[in-house]
Amino acid sequence: MTREDTFEMPRPYVICHMGMSLDGKVTGDFLSLTQCAAAVDAYYQVNRRYAGDAFACGRVTMEGSFTQGFQPDLTPYQGRTVPPMDYVADETATFFAVAFDRRGRLGWQCGRIEDEDPGYGNAHVVEVLCEGVAPEYLCYLQHIGVSYIFAGNEAGVLDLDLALFKLRRIFGIKKLLLEGGSILNGAFQREDKIDELSLVIMPCVGEEQDKPLFWQSALSEYQLEESRLINGAPWLRYVRKR
């Protein structure tokens, strides 16, 4: 029996799953190095092995990995009013891509992730927004079939407890893979919402400007539960000491 099997909280069990350089960086050109190819493949293998109900990323990570900077034309929706209420576009979805996009800036083109990797492909998109997002953007999301929830105030301050509660209650998400970037990882870590750490170590050192695993972290303790080599890359699994 795994830790998530006995997890009893009104939120998903959160696993922060990241590929990390030897000096603790999670973004940068090192991820495209030939020397790191086997470790990157190991990262995706572990992702599939976890078989989460959802994966979650911040706006910058989602933009770089999936929306590719697309900016939708919102002029057809200007002047429309939309009540600031949570919206479920697909009540039959069982696998989700959760985008923490406080201001509503991501340019999705449809309501599902198109990717050949089964760890990501066909995931239904759920936007986590703060209050005050433009109504024309909400209309656009509804038009293309993207779900959204509100969990934060108009100043852009995210209410992580509320977001996780809604993800569990509305969408039934029990196991959530948190996959960056460092700002979102740090927000989860500071609020003690990371139950498990899964780290695949890349055989390289990042550059000074590359981002760390956690941005503005707080002191916390984890216990090593498992370690092994996958494709020659070290995989370390830690659980939170509570």
Predicted features along the sequence, with ranges:
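Enzymes that bind and transform nitrogen-containing heteroaromatic metabolites
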Residues: 2-242
